[in-house]
Amino acid sequence: MVVPLQLQVPVTREGLRQAAEALRDWLAAAGLEGDAAYGAELGLEELGSNLLRHASPEGAATQLQIEARHSGALLELELIDNGAPFDPTTAALPNLHRPIQERPIGGLGLLLMRRMAAQLQYERLTDGNRLVCRFRAKARAAPPG
């Protein structure tokens, strides 16, 4: 079993860059690759960019807590922020049937995240948001010998 990744970063471009790098390193050390690893990276990137983009002085998130765990065939990414309520499991998705030039920008990351995750679970906390993303994971095969 791989030791879980636990870190807390400020909601800044640099903080999110450091979190993404730490997650990539942890995924590689855990031998995780493919859709689960990509989904976890996408989940962190999507939530982080939404926190940056939609941050307003009132209710803006300032901290993001990240925990990643791997057990058996499951990769779990837990993201907790101290911002205003935002439930990515119910947020409106883009209408893919409209011509691209008529679609508003945004929402495709959430769409991909919902499609890649085996389960997304949102909870509003007293002072923030908690999102748990679960992915079906396959570890890299160990080299023979």
Language model feature labels by segment:
Residues E21-E45, E102-P104:
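Conserved short strand/loop->alpha-helix "switch" segment adjacent to the catalytic nucleotide/phosphoryl-transfer site
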Residues N50, H54:
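Conserved N-box asparagine in the HATPase_c
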Residues A55-A60:
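A short, flexible helix-to-loop-to-beta junction within the catalytic ATP-binding CA
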